[in-house]
Amino acid sequence: MPPKNEKDLYIKIGEALKSIRKEKNLTITDIHAMSEFHSSTISLIERGKQNVSIGWLIHYANILEIDPTEIFLRAFKDDFQEMQLQKMYERFGTYTPESDNDENS
């Protein structure tokens, strides 16, 4: 489901950042040591409690050695899948096997 408000966006981005950091076996303290980011700021962002700029996300992605788009792909994966399903539904309409049989009769 697409984010309902700005807070939902922050939460999804924060969850993605935390997930990627943990996959890399890094702690918040590790990130702090690798950057100028304060541990408390990282924690707030990962919990969706603080807004971030695109520049901040790009810098953070560089620290994690990932492409910045990975953050957004993770954060909005479910939304992208839902949009794809909606496009398929719009393209194929309400196809049922019965409607195909009706056309062949």
Region roles according to the model:
Residues 21, 32, 61:
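The alpha-helix within a helix-turn-helix
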Residues 2, 72-105:
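Short, charged recognition helix plus adjacent turn
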Residues 25-44:
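Short alpha-helical DNA-recognition segment
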Residues 1-23:
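A short, Lys/Arg-rich alpha-helix, primarily the initiator
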Residues 17, 28, 39, 54-57:
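Helix-turn-helix DNA-binding elements, focusing on the entry/boundary residues of the two helices
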Residues 53-70:
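DNA major-groove recognition helix of helix-turn-helix/homeodomain DNA-binding modules
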